[in-house]
Amino acid sequence: MFHFTRRAHALCTLALLLLAVPAVCAAQTPTPAPAQDKAEEPPFHEYKGVRIGMTADEARKKLGNPTDKGDKQDYYALNDNESCEVYYDDAKKVYAVKITYLGGNAIPEPKKILGIEADTQQNGSLYKMLRFPKVGYWVSYTRTAGDSPMTLITMQKIQ
């Protein structure tokens, strides 16, 4: 049987404590939380200043006079390659915005809209929809296949 003096016993205890402290401290260090859905708000959260929840009057001030004006929807033909539809709920607030691009160079890439790449379908078209529950809406990106693709970007309140 081993017989330690008090001093030897104290030194062994101290050595064991010094070895154990870093392990205990490392176990208690909080690890950063992983990014949830890359972001709580998508990169595309407004179109020309129009956001979900904005009043119809505020949206019209941002976009100007619509080509076709209605209580539930406004249509804007911005140019030959770009149009926009803004949808309103019963409280006259924006609940959806859809932008349509017909060719041209101003088409944003999926990563700029969604924060990630869209899925390529077998026919060459692109599609991706992401829900952002913390901000209360979803965003989708659709591009048809072909030489002159049509691109639809939609942002809509989660019902």
Regions found by a protein language model. Give the residues of each.
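C-terminal segment of classical bacterial N-terminal signal peptides
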Residues: 18-26
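Bacterial N-terminal signal peptides that target proteins for export
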Residues: 2-15
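A cross-family detector of function-defining hotspots
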Residues: 39-40, 44-45, 51-159
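Cleaved targeting-peptide boundary
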Residues: 27-41
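Generic leucine side-chain signal with a strong bias for well-ordered alpha-helical environments
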Residues: 16-19, 63
